Amino acid sequence: MKGGGLHCRCSKCFAAPPRRRIKRRPRVLTLLSLPEDVLLYVLECLPAVDILSMREVHPHLRSLVDSHSSVWARASFQDVWPSSENLNLFERAAECGNFEACVKLGIAYLYNEGLSVSDDGRAEVNGLKASRFFSLTERLNAGADPFVWLFIRPPWSSSGSCCKAVVFDSLNEECGTVTSGEGATGALKGSIQYCLAKVLSLFEDDDKKREALGMLESSASNGCLHSAYLLWETKQKAALSDPGRYLQSFRQLRDYAARGCWDAQISLAKACGHKNPLNQEQRSAGELVNQVFQSSLPINKSSIFTTQKGMNDTMRYILIDWLVEVATMKDFSSLCLHMTVGLVDRYLKLRSVPRAKLQLVGIACMVICTRFISKEILTIREAVWLTDNTYKYEDLVRMMGEIISALEGKIRMPTVVDYKDVLSHLIPLDRNTLHLCSYISELSLLYTELSMYSPAQLAAGALLLARILHRQARPWPAQLAETTGFTLEHLTPCVVLLHKKCFHDDAPRDYRQVSLTAVKQRFQDDLYDQISKEKVMDHTHLCELLGVPCHDSESPATCPNAADFHQFLCSPSGNKTKRRREESIQEDRGSFVTTPTAELSNQEEDLLGDFLDWSLETSCSGYEGDRESEGEREGEVTAPSGVLDLSLLLTEHPQCQDSTTDDDSITLHPIPLLSKAENGTDSIEGCVEKSSGYSSVSSGGSPTSSSSPGLPFTPTPGLNHSKLTPIPFPQPCSPLLKASRRQVKRKNQAQHSEDNLSDEL
């Protein structure tokens, strides 16, 4: 075609060059491409050591780390302890508001653990530094009771300078320099004064007790709610005789309870059960008591096994059973035991713990709880001895820091015992019913399936079950239903599951086929009227009385497989005696050898040399003030010993097989071995000789059935009292008691001469 004409689009006359498609380079996305707030969040979730590494990667990361204190405030120091190499890292994080760093630094300086200081003036230097970080800890303590006092509580060292006393004096001086008033400064002063008052109240000196009252008044004026409640407790007895003063006292208590003081809420609930002329006041307070029971939430303990990959129900059962035996032999209260188990469960839900350290976690939690609520403490060195020196002194000190920091200082939490005590004040209970309720409550600690119910429901269910087993005509009266908000219909599934787990299913057995019955042995004591020997109604009969279908499939007791099991825990009876069977006989406490009671310093340990066989020669730490009372040094209190060993026993090695009899004397030689899955080999370098006590079983075992006859309680508006009818019990028959069987408190075979120890101290 001629120029200027239109071209067609055929292939002959139109051949336009194809358009090139330019490939765009893909955008390279890196960590630095994230928004700054997201990048900051990533840095805050890193361990402290990794933050330093990230800081060296890029100038932008260095700028974020240096300019944002929140990175260090939220840095994790899990399984890291202060030392001379990382001291600057810990101090920087503490100054930025890192709670974990403050707790660990305070404990490290107090116990001289990890941070070596010259012996000249060690108590003064360490005490001042520990005081500084304990003060920072209370400043950062949000939502928990003031707790640093449990580390400096008496007894104090009577020889030479005492680090605890230095911390106390330093904190007292700090309170003197801080002006009283509202705000963060006043709240900090109130918390520290509360801690100082708690320390002073534990002395036997009357002058110190009066000084403690003055400290509480000053603390309450600075806004400390816990101090105000303690002052109310001291004045409450005098107010009972005067109706006007009682009314004022009752209103104060109601105010403290409404402001969130847990102890005040419990005291208020108990006061509602007393007969007094303030009926109108009680009715208004009854609504708050109902809220206390209804606000109790279930604690999902089954999530423990999500965090603890190598742990199962049986291993937890064995650990709790061992803690019950320790509490029994040391005469610790039921509240202390429940708090210890709660502390263990909460820590295991947060932090992954190697199997070899489960016993360490348990005994460390008991040390913390005894110091928090008991007058008589479990000393660190005695706790180490209870585990047969499986762990060192410094291991327990560090584990205490890990637990306190992981739980953010929240030690005291509502327990079944708290709600049980309230219920015992609401209606009159006979002695045997109260003991049976306590027995059921402690049995409930052993089973994770029961955690589907809240502590308040478990306490109510335990009381209801106890009254049914004792054939009360109206086991759940209208007064309890109105006060707690739990009706008989709501509690029936909980009661059925409690009875099934506690009385119907068989208890797990250890590797020697011995039933783990520490709770049963605990309640065979005359103190509890031997309530665990009572014959209990069978499960079928209970279901018939409650009108629910009976699932009478008994869960088989979990027994270890002889071809594959790990020795887990030894009884706290020492390594020379067997764990007592049910036919054991109770012995008098006075006939026992007392336990080590002194927390010796390095110098004192060098002077004593090999006289004290505590297997702590490698320990470079110690605190001379951590010892027990004078009465314990004279033999008034005894304690067991136990051991944790996770050596794998294989059938290919017949020399390692358990071939003991009940009369043999047992000796344990712990050897640190790893399982085949952990070290990738089938060989072992030694064998563990025949041992007594607890053992774990295969990881797939479970001591209980997973079936549950009911669902957790859901509060419903309104109470239906038409169903609160008497349960038709048959005529009572004479109870058939089992043969009298008591537990023997074992003597320690190691020779610890208390007379010579006192001379050296």
Curated annotation (Swiss-Prot):
Residue numbers covered by motif D box 2: 355-358
SUPFAM superfamilies membership: Cyclin-like, F-box domain
Sequence motif Nuclear localization signal 1, residues: 19-27
Residue span, Cyclin N-terminal domain: 300-411
Keyword flag Signal: no
Region described as Disordered: 575-594, 677-761
Listed SMART domains: CYCLIN, Cyclin_C, FBOX
GO cellular component, one term: nucleus
Region (PEST) location: 589-745
Motif position, D box 1: 316-319
Biased composition (Low complexity): 691-718
GO function term, MF aspect, one: cyclin-dependent protein serine/threonine kinase regulator activity
Keywords, comma-separated and alphabetical: Cell cycle, Cell division, Cyclin, Cytoplasm, Cytoskeleton, Mitosis, Nucleus, Ubl conjugation pathway
Biased composition (Basic and acidic residues): 580-590
Domain F-box: 28-75
Compartments where found: Nucleus; Cytoplasm, Perinuclear region; Cytoplasm, Cytoskeleton, Microtubule organizing center, Centrosome, Centriole
Superkingdom of this protein's organism: Eukaryota
Subunit structure, interactors included: Component of the SCF(CCNF) complex.
Domain text: The nuclear localization signals mediate the localization to the nucleus. The D box motifs (amino acid sequence RxxL) are involved in substrate binding, and may be ubiquitinated.
Family indicated by similarity: Belongs to the cyclin family. Cyclin AB subfamily.
Protein name: Cyclin-F
The encoding gene: ccnf
